[in-house]
Amino acid sequence: MTAAATTTLPEGWCTRRPTLDDVPAILELVHASDIAAIGEPDFIADEVREMLTDPHTDMTRDCWLAVDATGKIVGWTFPHNATGGDRDFAEVYTWPEHGLPALRPLLALIMDRMAERAAELGHDPYEVRSGAVPTEQPLIDALTEAGFVFLKQHARMQMSLAGVSPMAPEPPAGVVVRPIRPDDEAEMRVFHAVIEESFRDTDHFSPGYHAWRQQLAGQSAVLFHEWLVAEVDGRVVGALQSSGPEEEDEGWVSRLAVLRAYRKRGIGEALLRRAFAVYAANGRVKAGLGVDMENPTQAARLYLGVGMTALYRANIYRTYVTARAA
């Protein structure tokens, strides 16, 4: 296959920029891709909106849709770098089989844009990562051809809440687990600070407070009654942030953080157990989260220990681009 062929769309196909009006059609595309790769949908409309409106993402410059000759959306690519740091994430979704001709053209577009984003954000070189489920061989081949190399795996964890009591077990002595007070600005800042500090020694960056609040404001609903803090001697030392629409049957742990000095005391498990109880009380039938299998805090061991299993794993790939002015 020639280089020209890999980045040329079929006759009658085109690319265009997305708008928020496209969210339902984009979600349909992502669900089709998910079902082909892992057997079930694993994305919600709020996540599509979030990816289109994230800090440092401009739909009119950073995102593309591929549209076939009938006008159907068959591909979507976008970046993800909410912190503005020196690492980005390139996502490319295509409709199973039918949308494959859009894969390399979309990847070429987003990678070309990555060089410009590097210059705009002031980073050179600029690290770019991407992901693929091991069964997504066409995507893996395209990433490899584009210079990406395998880095590690992430796992999508899940657990049934059947039989989980809405009353959580007591936390360890000296630890208090309670709901967050979302109307208390000082507590919201402390909550964010715990997450930011706890993730500092991992491979995952957290956006600053303003960007984080901006992300929350863009969600259709924020379920603060499913957010938790852990206190020791009156100090917030652990935080659990949940996400996902209330009508979903899965409670989602988007962030679980415990300050380094308070780890190995059962605080992370206490937060998880309380979250599972809250989810069960709210009628959810399962709990889920994502984890970096190379996380130095050994988070995967905690999740396996409380009964979660890997629904699927995704390979993470990495390359670097040189900054280039637009």
Report residues per predicted region.
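A short beta-loop-alpha structural element at the N-terminal edge
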Residues: 14-28, 176-193
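Conserved acetyl-CoA-binding loop-helix of GNAT-fold acetyltransferases
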Residues: 100-116, 255-258, 264-281, 300-305
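C-terminal "cap" of GNAT-fold acetyltransferases
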Residues: 156-178, 285-297, 309-326
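Phosphate-binding active sites in nucleotide-utilizing proteins
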Residues: 200-247, 253-256, 260, 269
